C-alpha cells in the first residue's frame, strides 16, 4: 500500500542482517525481521494469504549520550503486504486488501500497521487507518498480542473500504468542485500546494482509462498517483491528511 519512493528496497531475507540497537531500561527496539515474521504468522492465522510483498529501509540516527550521534543503517522500515481477496468480505473490483508496516530503531516513529488497499491498474495506495502496535515491547509474546489487536482493527477497517469506494465512485464532480476539493486536500496537508495543478492534470487527463469518469474516486486516485513521489514517511502523513479532507469525509 505504501509506495516506496526515496527508500532502499530490499528482500525480506535482507531484514535479518539489519542490526538492532541494544535495549535500554525504557526502550526496547523490535528487530525488523521479528515484526515481519509475526505479522505474516498472525495474518495467516486469520486466513489472510499474502500475494505480494515489498520492503524498504532508510538510515536513522540515535542520540546515545549528550553530543553523541550514532548512524544506524536500515533503522527505518517501511513495508507493504498485499492480500488475496478475503472470503465473505466484499471488496471493490480492481483493488486488493493491503497492509503497510512501519518500524524504527531510532525512535523516529512507533511500530504500526496501516490498513488500506492497492489499486491494481496503477499500483496507487489507499490508506484507511493507522494502528499503533506499541511504542515499546518487552517480549515476543507482547509483540504477538499487540499485532493481534492491530490485525483485528485492520480487518474492521478493511470492511469499510467497499463503502468508501462506492461513495466516491458515485459522487460526480464538476470541474469547479474538483478544483476546490484538490485545494482542500493540499490545505489539509496531503501534498504540497505545488502539486495542485499536477493532481488536476492527472484527474482531467488520467493515465488509466479506468479513471476517466469525473468522480471523486477518480480525483482520489489522481491525488494518490501524485503522492507516489513522496517519501514513505511523508506518504503516511499525507494519507492521514487526505482522509481528513472534505473529499474523503463527505457523505
Question: What residue ranges belong to the model's regions?
Answer:
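N-terminal low-complexity, intrinsically disordered segments
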Residues: 1-63, 69-72
Amino acid at each position: 500500500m505504501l509506495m516506496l519512493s526515496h527508500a532502499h528496497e530490499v528482500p525480506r531475507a535482507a531484514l535479518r542482517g539489519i542490526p538492532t540497537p541494544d535495549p535500554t531500561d525504557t526502550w526496547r527496539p523490535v528487530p525488523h525481521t521479528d515484526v515481519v515474521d509475526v505479522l505474516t504468522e498472525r495474518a495467516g492465522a486469520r486466513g489472510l494469504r499474502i500475494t505480494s510483498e515489498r520492503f524498504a529501509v532508510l538510515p536513522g540516527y540515535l542520540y546515545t549520550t549528550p553530543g553523541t550521534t550514532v548512524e544506524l543503517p536500515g533503522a527505518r522500515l517501511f513495508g507493504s503486504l498485499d492480500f488475496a481477496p478475503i472470503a465473505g468480505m466484499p471488496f471493490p473490483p480492481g483493488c486488493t486488501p493491503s497492509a503497510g508496516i512501519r518500524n524504527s530503531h531510532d525512535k523516529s516513529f512507533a511500530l504500526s500497521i496501516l490498513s488500506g488497499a492497492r489499486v491494481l491498474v496503477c499500483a496507487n495506495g489507499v490508506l484507511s487507518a493507522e494502528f499503533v502496535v506499541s511504542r515499546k515491547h518487552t517480549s515476543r509474546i507482547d509483540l504477538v498480542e499487540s499485532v493481534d489487536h492491530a490485525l483485528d482493527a485492520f480487518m474492521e477497517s478493511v470492511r469499510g473500504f467497499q463503502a468508501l469506494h462506492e461513495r466516491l465512485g458515485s459522487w460526480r464532480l464538476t470541474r469547479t468542485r474538483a478544483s476546490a476539493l484538490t485545494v482542500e486536500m493540499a490545505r489539509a496537508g496531503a501534498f504540497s500546494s505545488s502539486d495542485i495543478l499536477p493532481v488536476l492534470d492527472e484527474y482531467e487527463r488520467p493515465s488509466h482509462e479506468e479513471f476517466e469518469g469525473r468522480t471523486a474516486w477518480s480525483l482520489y486516485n489522481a491525488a494518490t498517483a501524485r503522492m507516489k513521489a513522496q517519501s514513505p514517511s511523508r506518504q503516511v502523513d499525507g494519507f492521514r491528511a487526505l482522509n481528513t479532507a472534505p473529499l474523503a469525509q463527505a457523505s
